[in-house]
């Protein structure tokens, strides 16, 4: 019998990224530079196991936060929760 694989995902508001970083992230996913999928409400982004420091500082900080929660994915959702320990941006 094959083992079931389950991966954790951090759900977070798109407001934790500046608009230009979110727009760039969506473009990088669409261009298959980042692994994920875009959606009207935000995006689903895979967190690579290495070299997350090459991402923008705002995105890196969220990826690092997600990794500390043992997450392999981040779901950015416009209606997602905000976290007091992370900066937020108005757009």
Which residue stretches match the model-derived regions?
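Short, compact, well-ordered microdomains
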Residues: 53-91
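Acidic (Asp/Glu-rich) sequence patches and key acidic residues
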Residues: 1-53
């Amino acid at each position: 019998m094959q083992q079931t694989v389950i991966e954790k995902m951090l759900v977070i508001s798109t407001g934790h990224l500046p608009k230009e970083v979110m727009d760039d992230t969506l473009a990088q996913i669409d261009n298959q530079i980042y692994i994920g999928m875009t959606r009207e409400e935000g995006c689903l982004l895979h967190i690579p196991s290495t070299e997350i420091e090459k991402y923008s500082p705002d995105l890196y900080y969220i990826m690092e936060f997600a990794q500390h929660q043992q997450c392999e994915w981040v779901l950015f959702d416009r209606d997602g929760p905000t976290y007091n320990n992370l900066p937020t941006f108005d757009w």
